[in-house]
Regions:
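Conserved beta-strand in the GNAT
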Residues: 59, 65-74, 90, 95
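Conserved GNAT acetyl-CoA-binding A-motif
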Residues: 110, 117-129
C-alpha cells in the first residue's frame, strides 16, 4: 500500500497519542499503567490546544493509520544574536513503527518539516538526536551545536 505524507489534524489525535506512547516505550522503556494514563490524558489536552497552532505533526499514513511521525514545536522567546526573529523550532518524536523502518519515512517527514519551518520564518530548528537518528539528521544538514553553556534543568518532582 502507498504511504501518504501529510500534516496531522485533530481527527488524528488518537493515532498521535499511540505514536507518542510507542516512542516513549522505545526510548524510556515500559511505563506503569498510571504513568501511561497520565501521559495519555495530558497528550489529549495538549494536541487539542496546540495542534496546528504551535505544534505541527508531520505524519506518514498507510491505510488511514499513522506509521511515522515528526513533531515540530514552535518556541517563541526574546530575540538574541542567534535567533533574531525570536522563533525557533524544536523537533520531537521522530518515530516510525518498527515494521516500516529503513524505508525513508523519517527522512521524508523531516524534509517536510524543514521546508515548513522555513515558511514560518524560524531562525533554526533544533533537536536532541538519538544514536540511531544522528546519521539521518547529519545527512539532512543538521550540525552539532557547540554551546558554551552547560545544559541543566530543575525538576519539581
Amino acid at each position: 500500500m502507498e504511504i501518504q505524507y501529510l500534516q496531522a489534524v485533530l481527527s488524528d489525535i488518537d493515532d498521535l497519542i499511540r505514536m507518542r506512547l510507542a516512542y516513549i516505550h522505545d526510548d524510556f522503556g515500559p511505563q506503569t499503567p498510571d504513568t501511561e494514563k497520565a501521559i495519555e490524558s495530558q497528550l489529549k489536552d495538549y494536541f487539542r490546544i496546540h495542534l496546528g497552532k504551535d505544534c505541527f505533526v508531520f505524519a506518514a499514513k498507510e491505510n488511514e493509520t499513522i506509521v511515522g511521525t515528526a513533531f515540530l514545536v514552535i518556541v517563541e522567546k526574546p530575540a538574541n544574536p542567534h535567533f533574531l526573529h525570536g522563533k525557533i523550532g524544536e523537533v520531537l518524536n521522530v518515530y516510525t513503527v518498527p515494521e516500516k523502518r529503513r524505508q525513508g519515512i523519517a527522512g521524508k517527514l523531516m524534509k517536510m518539516m524543514i521546508e515548513y519551518g522555513q515558511k514560518l520564518d524560524l531562525d533554526f530548528i533544533e533537536l536532541k538526536a538519538t544514536e540511531a537518528g544522528y546519521p539521518l539528521y547529519k545527512k539532512l544538514g543538521f550540525e552539532d551545536s557547540p554551546c558554551g553553556y552547560k545544559e541543566m534543568k530543575y525538576a519539581y518532582t
